[in-house]
């Protein structure tokens, strides 16, 4: 597994397993399957309501905790210094661990400055190894990075071949913040898996469109957390380190970028309203 070095020196796997929308009742089994495939980085969140399943699977694996890299996120309903501080303790308990490897502000809403202060404090206390943000567009990212003491190590954003975040990735180099992709397969939108460019390139390497798409992001040093509840798909997603895309391949895939979200805008009032109500 290839690692990437964060801005505080912490080594983070480039590829992990995401549990967004994994049923809490199924999560332990799914994470156990992912661990057996070889995944050691697991991405969860307070709002996913499956942190317990992640913690159970890691505990039961019998593998040393130090071998794992656990990511979780502080939800909007826990925004603010006091609430975020309490929620971090809850996450530690649910995950059955003394520390979280990477803790993110999940959404740029509510008192996320207060949340971030609580995260900085947890970092200094050794309860968190690295901190960052999620879904922070360039303006909100820059504002937070400029004013905070500990610069975000990671910004997790919608990132896939149709929305490549080239400009944001370049901008974040100012504070050495790494880009982390959610939705690396765009949840199949735009006929993702039937894309002619991805499939034509895949034929050269005997790889699927999904594997080519993942490899493209990984070669750009973008951290990826593909999700599947099927073990065979977990294995396919994991088998992306035995081939290298050429410069021509990379250029071809770059032309697929629409620079537009395929999901939602964090500046859409209706979406913001929904996020603010969700999980309250």
Where are these regions (language model features)?
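Acidic-and-aromatic substrate-binding clefts and catalytic sites of carbohydrate-active enzymes
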Residues: 22-25, 45-53, 77-82, 108-113, ...
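Alpha-helical scaffolding within the catalytic cores
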Residues: 1-4, 52-59, 88-90, 138-141, ...
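Short, acidic/polar
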Residues: 22-34, 79-95, 114, 139-142, ...
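Beta/alpha (TIM)-barrel catalytic core signal, keyed to glycine-rich beta->alpha loops juxtaposed to Asp/Glu
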Residues: 107-280
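Glycine/small-residue-rich loop that forms an oxyanion/phosphate-binding "nest" at active or ligand-binding sites
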Residues: 73-121
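Residues at the N-termini of beta-strands
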Residues: 41, 99-102, 130, 154
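Acidic (Asp/Glu)-rich catalytic clusters
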Residues: 7, 55-65, 89-96, 121-123, ...
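N-terminal binding-site loop/beta-alpha segment at the start of enzyme catalytic domains
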Residues: 1-68, 185, 278-280
């Amino acid at each position: 597994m290839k690692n990437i070095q964060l801005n505080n020196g912490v080594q983070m796997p480039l590829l992990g397993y995401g549990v967004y929308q994994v049923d809490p009742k199924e999560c332990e089994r799914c994470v156990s399957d992912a661990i057996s495939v070889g995944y050691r980085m697991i991405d969860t969140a307070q709002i996913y309501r499956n942190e317990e399943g992640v913690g159970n699977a890691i505990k039961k694996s019998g593998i040393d905790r130090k071998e794992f890299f656990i990511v979780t996120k502080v939800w909007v309903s826990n925004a603010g210094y006091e609430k975020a501080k309490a929620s971090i303790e809850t996450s530690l308990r649910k995950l059955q661990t003394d520390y979280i490897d990477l803790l993110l502000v999940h959404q740029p809403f509510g008192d996320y400055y207060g949340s971030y202060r609580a995260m900085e404090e947890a970092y200094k206390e050794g309860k968190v190894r690295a901190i960052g943000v999620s879904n922070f567009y360039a303006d909100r990212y820059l504002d937070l990075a400029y004013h905070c003491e500990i610069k975000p190590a990671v910004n997790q954003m919608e990132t896939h071949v149709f929305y490549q975040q080239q400009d944001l990735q370049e901008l974040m180099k100012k504070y050495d913040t790494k880009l982390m992709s959610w939705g690396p397969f765009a949840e199949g939108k735009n006929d993702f898996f039937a894309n002619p460019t991805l499939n034509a390139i895949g034929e050269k390497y005997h790889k699927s469109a999904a594997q080519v798409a993942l490899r493209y992001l990984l070669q750009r040093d973008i951290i990826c957390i593909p999700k599947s509840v099927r073990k065979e798909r977990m294995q396919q997603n994991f088998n992306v380190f035995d081939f290298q895309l050429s410069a021509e391949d990379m250029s071809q895939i770059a032309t697929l970028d629409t620079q537009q979200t395929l999901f939602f805008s964090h500046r859409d009032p209706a979406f913001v309203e929904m996020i603010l109500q969700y999980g309250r």
